[in-house]
A protein has these predicted regions:
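An alpha-helical support segment within catalytic cores of ATP-dependent transferases
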Residues: 5-19, 146, 158-197, 201, ...
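A glycine-centered beta->alpha junction motif in the catalytic cores
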Residues: 91, 106-121, 160-165, 290-307
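Active-site activation/catalytic loop segments of kinase-like enzymes and analogous catalytic loops
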Residues: 230-271, 287-304
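ATP-binding pocket architecture of kinase catalytic cores
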Residues: 41-145
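Active-site acidic catalytic loop and adjacent metal/ATP-binding pocket
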Residues: 33-50, 54, 85-86, 183-231
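ATP/Mg2+ or Mg2+-diphosphate-binding catalytic cores
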Residues: 292-332
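A cross-family kinase active-site recognition segment
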Residues: 120-170, 190-192, 226
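Conserved NTP-binding catalytic cores of kinases and kinase-like/nucleotidyltransferase enzymes
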Residues: 1-85, 208-213, 330-332
Length: 332
Protein backbone atom coordinates (compact mmCIF):
# COMPACT_ATOMS: atom_id res chain seq x y z
CA UNK A 1 0.00 0.00 0.00
CA UNK A 2 1.44 3.34 -1.05
CA UNK A 3 0.08 6.86 -1.55
CA UNK A 4 -0.35 8.17 -5.09
CA UNK A 5 -3.37 10.49 -4.70
CA UNK A 6 -3.29 13.10 -1.95
CA UNK A 7 -6.40 14.31 -0.10
CA UNK A 8 -6.86 17.29 2.20
CA UNK A 9 -8.01 16.98 5.80
CA UNK A 10 -11.30 18.59 4.78
CA UNK A 11 -11.83 15.86 2.18
CA UNK A 12 -11.02 13.13 4.67
CA UNK A 13 -13.43 14.72 7.15
CA UNK A 14 -16.26 14.79 4.60
CA UNK A 15 -15.76 11.22 3.37
CA UNK A 16 -15.42 9.74 6.86
CA UNK A 17 -18.49 11.62 8.00
CA UNK A 18 -20.62 9.67 5.52
CA UNK A 19 -20.05 6.64 7.76
CA UNK A 20 -20.34 8.40 11.08
CA UNK A 21 -16.56 8.29 11.55
CA UNK A 22 -15.28 11.44 13.27
CA UNK A 23 -12.05 12.22 11.42
CA UNK A 24 -9.09 13.56 13.39
CA UNK A 25 -5.96 12.59 11.46
CA UNK A 26 -4.80 10.55 8.44
CA UNK A 27 -1.40 8.85 8.28
CA UNK A 28 -0.12 7.36 4.98
CA UNK A 29 0.48 3.61 4.77
CA UNK A 30 3.59 2.93 2.69
CA UNK A 31 3.54 -0.90 2.46
CA UNK A 32 2.21 -2.33 -0.80
CA UNK A 33 2.38 -1.07 -4.35
CA UNK A 34 -1.03 -0.45 -5.94
CA UNK A 35 -3.45 1.82 -4.06
CA UNK A 36 -3.43 4.91 -1.84
CA UNK A 37 -4.01 4.02 1.81
CA UNK A 38 -4.16 5.81 5.13
CA UNK A 39 -4.74 4.93 8.77
CA UNK A 40 -7.56 7.08 10.15
CA UNK A 41 -7.53 8.38 13.71
CA UNK A 42 -10.88 9.45 15.15
CA UNK A 43 -11.81 11.63 18.11
CA UNK A 44 -12.33 8.42 20.09
CA UNK A 45 -8.81 7.10 19.46
CA UNK A 46 -6.09 7.89 21.97
CA UNK A 47 -2.40 8.65 21.50
CA UNK A 48 -1.15 6.81 18.39
CA UNK A 49 -4.17 4.53 17.98
CA UNK A 50 -5.94 4.26 14.64
CA UNK A 51 -9.32 2.59 14.31
CA UNK A 52 -9.96 2.66 10.54
CA UNK A 53 -8.23 2.24 7.18
CA UNK A 54 -9.12 4.53 4.27
CA UNK A 55 -8.33 3.20 0.76
CA UNK A 56 -8.52 5.02 -2.57
CA UNK A 57 -8.28 2.51 -5.41
CA UNK A 58 -5.95 3.80 -8.11
CA UNK A 59 -6.46 1.15 -10.80
CA UNK A 60 -9.60 -0.90 -10.22
CA UNK A 61 -12.88 0.55 -11.49
CA UNK A 62 -15.78 1.48 -9.23
CA UNK A 63 -17.64 -1.55 -10.65
CA UNK A 64 -14.77 -3.86 -9.67
CA UNK A 65 -14.63 -2.48 -6.13
CA UNK A 66 -18.39 -2.88 -5.81
CA UNK A 67 -17.95 -6.59 -6.59
CA UNK A 68 -15.19 -6.77 -4.00
CA UNK A 69 -17.51 -5.34 -1.33
CA UNK A 70 -20.03 -8.11 -2.02
CA UNK A 71 -17.28 -10.71 -1.70
CA UNK A 72 -16.01 -9.31 1.59
CA UNK A 73 -19.46 -9.24 3.13
CA UNK A 74 -19.96 -12.86 2.02
CA UNK A 75 -16.80 -13.84 3.91
CA UNK A 76 -17.21 -11.76 7.06
CA UNK A 77 -18.76 -14.53 9.17
CA UNK A 78 -16.29 -17.21 8.03
CA UNK A 79 -12.89 -15.51 8.13
CA UNK A 80 -11.19 -12.64 10.00
CA UNK A 81 -11.71 -9.80 7.54
CA UNK A 82 -12.80 -6.18 7.88
CA UNK A 83 -15.98 -5.69 5.81
CA UNK A 84 -16.29 -2.14 4.42
CA UNK A 85 -18.34 0.29 6.49
CA UNK A 86 -21.89 1.04 5.34
CA UNK A 87 -22.96 4.67 4.81
CA UNK A 88 -25.39 6.27 7.23
CA UNK A 89 -27.72 6.84 4.26
CA UNK A 90 -27.62 3.17 3.14
CA UNK A 91 -30.88 1.72 1.85
CA UNK A 92 -29.86 -1.93 2.10
CA UNK A 93 -30.84 -2.55 -1.52
CA UNK A 94 -27.26 -2.70 -2.86
CA UNK A 95 -24.35 -3.46 -0.53
CA UNK A 96 -21.86 -2.10 -3.08
CA UNK A 97 -23.52 1.30 -3.42
CA UNK A 98 -24.04 1.38 0.34
CA UNK A 99 -20.27 1.18 0.93
CA UNK A 100 -18.42 2.70 -2.05
CA UNK A 101 -17.57 6.41 -2.34
CA UNK A 102 -16.02 8.15 -5.35
CA UNK A 103 -13.23 10.67 -5.80
CA UNK A 104 -12.39 11.75 -9.37
CA UNK A 105 -14.08 8.52 -10.53
CA UNK A 106 -11.92 6.41 -8.21
CA UNK A 107 -13.53 4.19 -5.60
CA UNK A 108 -13.00 4.76 -1.88
CA UNK A 109 -13.72 2.42 1.03
CA UNK A 110 -13.39 2.81 4.78
CA UNK A 111 -12.91 -0.37 6.83
CA UNK A 112 -12.29 -1.08 10.52
CA UNK A 113 -8.61 -1.52 11.34
CA UNK A 114 -8.03 -5.12 12.35
CA UNK A 115 -5.84 -6.00 15.31
CA UNK A 116 -2.57 -7.82 14.79
CA UNK A 117 0.74 -7.36 13.00
CA UNK A 118 2.23 -8.50 9.71
CA UNK A 119 4.52 -11.51 10.18
CA UNK A 120 8.22 -11.08 9.48
CA UNK A 121 8.72 -14.85 9.57
CA UNK A 122 6.39 -17.85 9.34
CA UNK A 123 6.38 -21.36 10.80
CA UNK A 124 4.68 -24.63 9.91
CA UNK A 125 1.73 -23.97 12.25
CA UNK A 126 1.06 -20.62 10.57
CA UNK A 127 1.28 -22.24 7.14
CA UNK A 128 -1.23 -24.90 8.24
CA UNK A 129 -3.58 -22.14 9.42
CA UNK A 130 -3.21 -20.30 6.11
CA UNK A 131 -4.02 -23.47 4.19
CA UNK A 132 -7.26 -23.81 6.14
CA UNK A 133 -8.09 -20.13 5.64
CA UNK A 134 -7.55 -20.22 1.88
CA UNK A 135 -9.62 -23.38 1.47
CA UNK A 136 -12.39 -21.80 3.56
CA UNK A 137 -12.31 -18.76 1.28
CA UNK A 138 -12.56 -20.96 -1.82
CA UNK A 139 -15.48 -23.00 -0.46
CA UNK A 140 -17.39 -20.01 0.94
CA UNK A 141 -17.22 -18.03 -2.30
CA UNK A 142 -18.73 -20.94 -4.22
CA UNK A 143 -22.07 -19.57 -2.98
CA UNK A 144 -21.66 -16.53 -5.28
CA UNK A 145 -22.89 -17.71 -8.68
CA UNK A 146 -22.19 -17.30 -11.48
CA UNK A 147 -18.67 -16.69 -10.18
CA UNK A 148 -17.73 -14.68 -13.28
CA UNK A 149 -20.18 -11.96 -12.19
CA UNK A 150 -18.16 -11.31 -9.03
CA UNK A 151 -14.53 -11.64 -10.07
CA UNK A 152 -12.59 -8.74 -11.54
CA UNK A 153 -10.96 -9.09 -14.98
CA UNK A 154 -7.63 -10.88 -14.96
CA UNK A 155 -4.62 -8.73 -15.80
CA UNK A 156 -3.06 -9.23 -19.23
CA UNK A 157 0.24 -10.68 -18.05
CA UNK A 158 1.00 -12.07 -21.50
CA UNK A 159 1.26 -8.50 -22.81
CA UNK A 160 3.57 -7.53 -19.93
CA UNK A 161 5.66 -10.64 -20.59
CA UNK A 162 6.13 -9.73 -24.25
CA UNK A 163 7.23 -6.21 -23.32
CA UNK A 164 9.61 -7.24 -20.56
CA UNK A 165 11.21 -10.30 -22.17
CA UNK A 166 12.20 -8.14 -25.14
CA UNK A 167 14.69 -6.38 -22.85
CA UNK A 168 15.69 -9.27 -20.56
CA UNK A 169 19.04 -11.07 -20.77
CA UNK A 170 18.71 -14.19 -22.90
CA UNK A 171 18.85 -16.63 -19.97
CA UNK A 172 16.10 -14.78 -18.06
CA UNK A 173 13.83 -14.61 -21.10
CA UNK A 174 14.39 -18.33 -21.73
CA UNK A 175 13.49 -19.14 -18.12
CA UNK A 176 10.30 -17.10 -18.39
CA UNK A 177 9.30 -18.63 -21.73
CA UNK A 178 10.04 -22.21 -20.66
CA UNK A 179 7.92 -21.89 -17.51
CA UNK A 180 5.05 -20.34 -19.46
CA UNK A 181 5.19 -23.17 -22.01
CA UNK A 182 4.98 -25.73 -19.20
CA UNK A 183 2.03 -23.88 -17.68
CA UNK A 184 0.23 -23.89 -21.04
CA UNK A 185 0.49 -27.69 -21.08
CA UNK A 186 -1.15 -28.21 -17.67
CA UNK A 187 -4.53 -30.01 -17.62
CA UNK A 188 -7.34 -27.63 -18.54
CA UNK A 189 -9.81 -29.23 -16.14
CA UNK A 190 -8.13 -28.04 -12.93
CA UNK A 191 -10.86 -26.84 -10.52
CA UNK A 192 -11.67 -23.14 -10.77
CA UNK A 193 -13.54 -20.57 -8.75
CA UNK A 194 -13.20 -17.20 -7.04
CA UNK A 195 -9.62 -16.79 -5.76
CA UNK A 196 -7.84 -14.12 -3.71
CA UNK A 197 -4.67 -14.18 -5.89
CA UNK A 198 -2.58 -11.94 -3.61
CA UNK A 199 -2.44 -13.75 -0.26
CA UNK A 200 1.08 -12.75 0.70
CA UNK A 201 2.16 -12.62 4.33
CA UNK A 202 1.93 -8.83 4.27
CA UNK A 203 -1.76 -9.20 3.43
CA UNK A 204 -2.33 -11.05 6.70
CA UNK A 205 -2.35 -10.02 10.37
CA UNK A 206 -1.50 -12.18 13.37
CA UNK A 207 -1.63 -12.08 17.15
CA UNK A 208 1.71 -13.30 18.51
CA UNK A 209 0.94 -12.74 22.19
CA UNK A 210 0.24 -16.41 22.99
CA UNK A 211 2.17 -19.63 22.58
CA UNK A 212 0.74 -20.07 19.07
CA UNK A 213 0.31 -17.34 16.47
CA UNK A 214 -3.37 -16.61 15.81
CA UNK A 215 -4.62 -15.34 12.43
CA UNK A 216 -6.50 -12.07 13.01
CA UNK A 217 -6.86 -10.57 9.55
CA UNK A 218 -6.93 -11.22 5.81
CA UNK A 219 -6.44 -8.10 3.69
CA UNK A 220 -6.59 -6.74 0.12
CA UNK A 221 -9.36 -8.36 -1.89
CA UNK A 222 -8.82 -6.18 -4.98
CA UNK A 223 -7.54 -9.06 -7.11
CA UNK A 224 -10.31 -11.60 -6.43
CA UNK A 225 -11.04 -13.28 -9.74
CA UNK A 226 -12.05 -16.60 -11.26
CA UNK A 227 -8.93 -18.72 -11.61
CA UNK A 228 -7.60 -22.18 -10.88
CA UNK A 229 -7.70 -22.78 -7.14
CA UNK A 230 -4.21 -24.22 -7.55
CA UNK A 231 -2.94 -20.82 -8.67
CA UNK A 232 -4.19 -19.25 -5.44
CA UNK A 233 -2.58 -22.08 -3.49
CA UNK A 234 0.75 -21.62 -5.29
CA UNK A 235 0.78 -17.84 -4.83
CA UNK A 236 0.23 -18.21 -1.09
CA UNK A 237 2.73 -21.04 -0.70
CA UNK A 238 5.37 -19.07 -2.59
CA UNK A 239 5.34 -16.31 0.00
CA UNK A 240 4.47 -18.12 3.23
CA UNK A 241 6.93 -20.95 2.62
CA UNK A 242 9.85 -18.82 1.40
CA UNK A 243 12.36 -16.96 3.54
CA UNK A 244 13.36 -13.73 1.83
CA UNK A 245 16.84 -12.53 2.74
CA UNK A 246 17.69 -8.87 3.33
CA UNK A 247 20.05 -6.71 1.29
CA UNK A 248 22.68 -7.41 3.96
CA UNK A 249 22.79 -11.12 3.15
CA UNK A 250 22.50 -10.78 -0.61
CA UNK A 251 18.69 -11.06 -0.70
CA UNK A 252 18.71 -14.85 -0.57
CA UNK A 253 15.64 -16.93 -1.45
CA UNK A 254 15.07 -20.11 0.58
CA UNK A 255 12.01 -22.31 0.00
CA UNK A 256 10.86 -24.61 2.83
CA UNK A 257 9.10 -27.81 1.75
CA UNK A 258 8.06 -28.65 5.34
CA UNK A 259 6.07 -25.42 5.46
CA UNK A 260 4.54 -26.25 2.08
CA UNK A 261 3.39 -29.67 3.29
CA UNK A 262 1.88 -28.07 6.42
CA UNK A 263 0.01 -25.61 4.21
CA UNK A 264 -1.33 -28.39 1.98
CA UNK A 265 -2.38 -30.45 5.02
CA UNK A 266 -4.33 -27.46 6.33
CA UNK A 267 -5.92 -26.79 2.96
CA UNK A 268 -6.96 -30.40 2.45
CA UNK A 269 -8.65 -30.47 5.85
CA UNK A 270 -11.25 -28.22 4.20
CA UNK A 271 -10.98 -29.01 0.47
CA UNK A 272 -9.02 -32.07 -0.77
CA UNK A 273 -6.86 -31.57 -3.86
CA UNK A 274 -7.49 -33.56 -7.00
CA UNK A 275 -4.82 -35.85 -8.47
CA UNK A 276 -4.31 -33.39 -11.34
CA UNK A 277 -3.81 -30.53 -8.89
CA UNK A 278 -1.12 -32.46 -7.04
CA UNK A 279 0.68 -33.26 -10.29
CA UNK A 280 0.46 -29.68 -11.56
CA UNK A 281 1.62 -27.96 -8.36
CA UNK A 282 5.39 -27.80 -9.14
CA UNK A 283 4.79 -26.06 -12.47
CA UNK A 284 2.19 -23.77 -10.93
CA UNK A 285 4.64 -22.70 -8.21
CA UNK A 286 7.17 -21.70 -10.88
CA UNK A 287 4.54 -20.00 -13.04
CA UNK A 288 3.14 -17.95 -10.16
CA UNK A 289 6.64 -16.77 -9.29
CA UNK A 290 6.97 -15.46 -12.87
CA UNK A 291 3.64 -13.61 -12.53
CA UNK A 292 4.89 -11.69 -9.50
CA UNK A 293 8.25 -11.18 -11.19
CA UNK A 294 6.31 -9.51 -14.02
CA UNK A 295 4.06 -7.62 -11.61
CA UNK A 296 7.04 -5.97 -9.93
CA UNK A 297 8.62 -5.12 -13.27
CA UNK A 298 5.27 -3.68 -14.35
CA UNK A 299 5.08 -1.45 -11.27
CA UNK A 300 8.56 -0.11 -12.02
CA UNK A 301 7.51 0.50 -15.64
CA UNK A 302 4.37 2.46 -14.71
CA UNK A 303 6.07 4.41 -11.93
CA UNK A 304 8.61 5.54 -14.51
CA UNK A 305 5.96 6.25 -17.17
CA UNK A 306 3.80 8.28 -14.78
CA UNK A 307 6.61 10.00 -12.91
CA UNK A 308 5.69 8.43 -9.57
CA UNK A 309 8.43 9.18 -7.05
CA UNK A 310 8.85 9.94 -3.37
CA UNK A 311 9.06 8.28 0.02
CA UNK A 312 5.41 7.19 -0.12
CA UNK A 313 6.05 4.95 -3.17
CA UNK A 314 7.08 1.36 -2.46
CA UNK A 315 8.78 -0.87 -5.03
CA UNK A 316 9.49 -4.55 -4.34
CA UNK A 317 12.54 -6.22 -5.85
CA UNK A 318 11.57 -8.28 -8.95
CA UNK A 319 14.81 -10.28 -8.78
CA UNK A 320 13.56 -12.14 -5.70
CA UNK A 321 10.67 -13.60 -7.68
CA UNK A 322 12.98 -14.37 -10.59
CA UNK A 323 15.20 -16.39 -8.24
CA UNK A 324 12.20 -18.20 -6.78
CA UNK A 325 10.95 -19.08 -10.27
CA UNK A 326 14.39 -20.44 -11.14
CA UNK A 327 14.52 -22.43 -7.90
CA UNK A 328 11.18 -24.09 -8.60
CA UNK A 329 12.10 -24.73 -12.24
CA UNK A 330 15.27 -26.62 -11.33
CA UNK A 331 13.10 -29.14 -9.42
CA UNK A 332 10.77 -29.95 -12.34
Amino acid sequence: MSVYTHLSDDEFFAFCGLFGVTFKKAVPITQGIKNSNWFIQTDSDVDDEFSHVFTLFEERSVADITKMVTIMHALKDKLPIAPPLVKLTATGDDIGSDCVMRYENKAILVVPKLLGTHPTTTNTAMCHTMGQALATLHKTLQTLQPAENYGVPLYDWARVKERETAYMPTDEARLMNDIWAAYANLPHDLPRGLCHLDMFADNTLWDFSGDTARLTGLLDFTEVSVEHYLMDIAITINDFCTTWGSARDGESVNFNTDKMMAFIDGYEAIRPLTDNERTALPVMLAYCATIFWLLRLNVIYYNREQGRTGDDIMVKNPDLMKRLASLHWTKI
